Amino acid sequence: MNETQIQRETRQVVEDVLEKTNLKQGALFVLGLSSSEVLGGQIGKESSQEIGELIVETILGILGSRGIHLAVQGCEHVNRALVVERQVAEQFDLEIVSVHPTLHAGGSGQLAAFKFMQDPVEVEFIKAHAGLDIGDTAIGMHVKHVQVPIRPILREIGHAHVTALASRPKLIGGARAHYPQDAIRKS
């Protein structure tokens, strides 16, 4: 698999999703990543530390330049806990849990987050403003209600299917209420 191509596709998809979601500085962005799927394998079966590092480092660079916080979701073997910076866990009052990811429990994305973040910790749950799912890892449990599907510019990174979610405030009030337009709500 061509690493330059994977990096280019990752950059393209992330920048497109950020443009479509209109995330602000300080927002939380969740990443679900199967490096196995990126390489054309079955999720959890052919994990690649190199691919995890390439993708996470690329995404951290893009989000960091915009002041957006990354949370990297682990697999079911760590109960889908997430790696975030300690400062983010404290700022959002997230419960820190005790686990250190491995390639097959947490996955390559979490290992990469531990490598590239300043002070990484694992947290049990978050409510992200948006997120990217590379390889059908199921990030929905970590994105705020109401979730809005975002169709990225590319449908795959490497061989992995790619989807994205944004969130918008709930519409309440009934027939008499009026709602402001927002960038992601469908008309």
Curated annotation (Swiss-Prot):
Q: List the disulfide bonds.
A: none
**Entry's Pfam families?**
DUF436 (PF04260)
Superkingdom in the source lineage: Bacteria
Record SUPFAM superfamilies: TTHA0583/YokD-like (SSF110710)
UniProt lists the family membership as follows: Belongs to the UPF0340 family.
> Which HAMAP family did the record assign?
UPF0340
Protein name (record): UPF0340 protein SPG_0604
What are the leading ranks of the lineage? Bacteria, Bacillati, Bacillota, Bacilli, Lactobacillales
